[in-house]
C-alpha cells in the first residue's frame, strides 16, 4: 500500500532518512511531500520530494528497505508520485542519482531521460533525470 506520510511516521522516517534535517522532514510531511510504502502495518520504503526552481516536482529520495527491494515497491511509489504531480497540474518531474548504473537503469526504464550532470569536488557525478508527464500516463 502507498500512502501519504503522517506526523506519526516521523520517528520511523527520522531513523531511516539521514539526508534531511528533522524540521525539514516534518515540513515536507505536513505538505504531503512524503509517500510511504507499507506492507501490512510495516513501513518498508519512502519517497520524498520538493520543488526544483519552485515549479517542477523533484524526487529527492526514493528508498526501499533491503528485504523489500526488487518487488516493484519503488515503481509503485514513483507511479503514485507521478500521478499526484499530474493531478496537481505539473507537466514534468525530475530526479537524480549518483553514477549508479542500477539506479540509472531503473529511472530510464520508467521513462526518465538524462537532463544533465552535476559535478561537485570529491563527489561522484550526480545524473539529473527529467520526465514529461502526459495526461494519459
Label each PLM-derived region with a short phrase:
Residues 85-98:
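Conserved GNAT acetyl-CoA-binding A-motif
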Residues 103, 110:
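Helix-turn-helix
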Residues 70-83, 108-109:
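Conserved acetyl-CoA-binding loop-helix of GNAT-fold acetyltransferases
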Residues 4-60, 65, 78-79, 84, ...:
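Acetyl-CoA-dependent GNAT
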Residues 31, 55, 101, 121-125:
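Short acidic/glycine-enriched loop/turn segments that link adjacent beta-strands
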Residues 62-69, 98:
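A short, internal acetyl-CoA/4′-phosphopantetheine-binding micro-motif in the GNAT/acyltransferase core
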Residues 94-96, 113-128:
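Conserved catalytic-core motifs of GNAT/GCN5-like acyltransferases
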Amino acid at each position: 500500500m502507498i500512502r501519504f506520510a503522517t506526523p506519526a511516521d516521523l520517528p520511523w522516517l527520522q531513523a531511516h532518512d539521514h539526508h534531511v534535517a528533522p524540521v525539514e522532514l516534518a515540513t515536507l510531511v505536513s505538505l504531503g511531500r512524503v509517500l510511504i510504502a507499507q506492507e501490512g502495518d510495516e513501513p518498508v520504503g519512502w519517497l520524498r520530494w520538493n520543488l526544483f526552481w519552485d515549479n517542477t516536482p523533484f524526487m529527492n529520495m526514493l528508498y526501499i528497505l533491503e528485504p523489500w527491494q526488487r518487488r516493484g515497491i519503488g515503481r509503485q511509489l514513483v507511479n503514485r508520485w507521478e500521478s499526484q504531480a499530474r493531478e496537481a497540474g505539473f507537466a514534468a518531474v525530475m530526479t537524480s542519482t549518483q553514477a549508479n548504473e542500477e539506479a540509472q537503469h531503473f529511472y530510464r526504464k520508467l521513462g526518465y531521460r538524462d537532463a544533465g550532470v552535476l559535478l561537485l569536488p570529491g563527489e561522484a557525478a550526480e545524473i539529473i533525470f527529467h520526465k514529461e508527464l502526459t495526461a494519459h500516463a
